Each structure stands twice: as C-alpha cells, then as structure tokens.
Amino acid sequence: MIFRFNKKKYKGIWFFGLSGSGKTYFSEKIKSKIKNHVLVDGDNVRKLISSDLNYSKAHRKIQISRVLGIARLIIESNKFPIISTVYMDKNINYLCKKNKIMCLMILRKDFGKMKKNFIIYKKKNVVGKDIFYENFKKIELINDNSPLIFKC
C-alpha cells in the first residue's frame, strides 16, 4: 500500500482508530520520513498527564483536547507532531483541520476476528464496543497487513 502525504500542506498528522488497528505501526513508519518530528502517543499522555481521567466518553473528549494542546505546542516549536489516539470527535477533528493537522482513521481489514481475542474488549467504556465515533467526515486508511510505503 502506498500512502502519499504532502508535508508542505500539513503541520502534523494524527492517527486514530481502535486498539490494535495499527496506529503505532503507522506512526513509526512515517517518522522516518519527517525531520523534526515528535511522537505523541495517547497512551503515554494518559499515563503522564491525564492520569486524572477515566475511559468514559466525556473523559476521552478531555483527553483528546489535551493531546491537541500538546500538538499545538509542538507546532509552535517548529516541530512536526505525529499523534496516535484511540478516540476522535467531530470538534477536535475540525480544530485539527484549522491547525493543519491531517487526521486519519486507521481501519484493520481483519479486525472482526482479532477483536474477539483482545482482553480490552471484555472491559467497559471501550471504543468500538460501548463508545462509538461521532458522525463526521473521516479520511480512512485500511491496514490490510500489506507493506506500507509513505511518500512525502
């Protein structure tokens, strides 16, 4: 799979999708193509900054708002944020566009089979099980386990 990304048009990139969809994989792939990048993993932000939040939909909205704030600080420092989170909503997606951050939803082709084996899907407040994405226009990238080539 070849993914073309215009570095001159965007100041950052944000991958979002269900647990196990490949967000970290895509982040790792694109970082080698972009100088002055800073990786922002939603799990790390939750552990280091948002430990006061739980996994409810309301707290997920607060979490991604904080992640956007971090991304904006990175952009102001003339660096390129590469972000990955599970959740995204219509408002933050809109603010990302205003800040020239491209948002991509990662979908896994074989996810139905995989989901049954993930322990996380036995818990509550799980995106894709109890919490669903709001209805907004999303750019989708299908992870079908084929080799990925980023063209920047």
Question: Where do the PLM segments sit?
Answer:
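NTP-dependent small-molecule kinase module
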Residues: 1-8, 29, 33, 98, ...
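Conserved substrate/cofactor phosphate-moiety recognition/catalytic segment
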Residues: 27-76
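Walker A/P-loop
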Residues: 24
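Small-molecule kinase domains that catalyze NTP-dependent phosphoryl transfer to phosphate-bearing small molecules
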Residues: 114-152
